[in-house]
Amino acid sequence: MIKKRVFSGIQPTGNIHLGNYLGAVKNWVDSQDEFDNIFCIVNSHAITIKQDPALLRAKTYELAAVLLACGIDMKKSKLFIQSEVDEHAALAWILDCNIPMGDMSRMTQFKDKSQKNPKNINIGLFNYPALMAADILLYQTDFVPVGEDQKQHLELTRDVAERFNRDYGETFKIPEPMIPKMGARIMGLDDPTKKMSKSEGKPNHGIALLDTPDEILKKFKKATTDSENLVRFNPEQIGIFNLLTIYQIFTGYSQEVIEAEFEGKGYGIFKVAVAEAVIEGLKPIQERYAKLTKEQGYLEEVLSHGASEVRKIAQKTYKEVKERVGLI
């Protein structure tokens, strides 16, 4: 039986955090037996914001090690670096030439990012969705795991594919969104109205996967909650609901069991319990990561093999696209 293909990308910037892990990476790991997974470290996307070259290279390998430590299995999945496969940029240019300006101008993420970085607005940032579309369409992808903030970009990708197929003949699969039921949107510990983000610089905003036990405990103790002091799954209690979501994913307990466990107990006790569950859950990941960082040659070999595997698919698609549009 042929497995459905899933494409997922993650930028090698900032520190990979609990939101990335619970909202994306854990689902990637859990789905490896079910799907034909392609995981891409999207370093070309990263340079839409000016990066320190040496740090970007280091972060790229660090992210690869973290993903492998989280359980990405190269016997079941493909992991590679975006810039190692030239067809991503080449297809993005062809798509650029087939996307109306109006469609790109409506992308809300460009507006948000350009407001945050008004001195660094570049064409790459504006064209970001075209490269994302190329990433996805290059591999004839069936499903793309997306959070709410990326749904608009996937809708553009679908529109681009449908328009291209209509104008040039059937070429691309039309990808479907895959939105996880739990953990899709882990919020910031300091401000639970905002999604946990790698680009947020505040020290108590998120839990990095490589944080020490002491750092994790301190951050959870300082997490924003409310004055009700009731540990219950009430979405209106946004701070405590966020912590409950994290706790439930790490423990696997039902809502009823968790609420009964902490009935009559204060937020302080609950916060420590969440921290302990996270520390215990991240321990094997951190141990595997420590081993992998000592094996740079192995990391490079794994990533090179991954690029070699996906390049075969990418070249086949790009060759067909070139022929469709009349390029030699």
Curated annotation (Swiss-Prot):
Positions occupied by motif 'KMSKS' region: 195-199
Gene Ontology MF annotations: ATP binding; tryptophan-tRNA ligase activity
Keywords, sorted A to Z: Aminoacyl-tRNA synthetase, ATP-binding, Cytoplasm, Ligase, Nucleotide-binding, Protein biosynthesis
Keyword Cytoplasm recorded: yes
Swiss-Prot/TrEMBL catalytic activity: tRNA(Trp) + L-tryptophan + ATP = L-tryptophyl-tRNA(Trp) + AMP + diphosphate + H(+)
Binding site for L-tryptophan: D135
One term under GO cellular component: cytosol
InterPro entries: aa-tRNA-synth_I_CS, aa-tRNA-synth_Ic, Rossmann-like_a/b/a_fold, Trp-tRNA-ligase, Trp-tRNA-ligase_bac-type, Trp-tRNA_synthetase
Alphabetical list of NCBIfam families matching this protein: trpS
Quaternary data: Homodimer.
Protein name, entry field: Tryptophan--tRNA ligase
Natural source organism: Wolinella succinogenes (strain ATCC 29543 / DSM 1740 / CCUG 13145 / JCM 31913 / LMG 7466 / NCTC 11488 / FDC 602W) (Vibrio succinogenes)
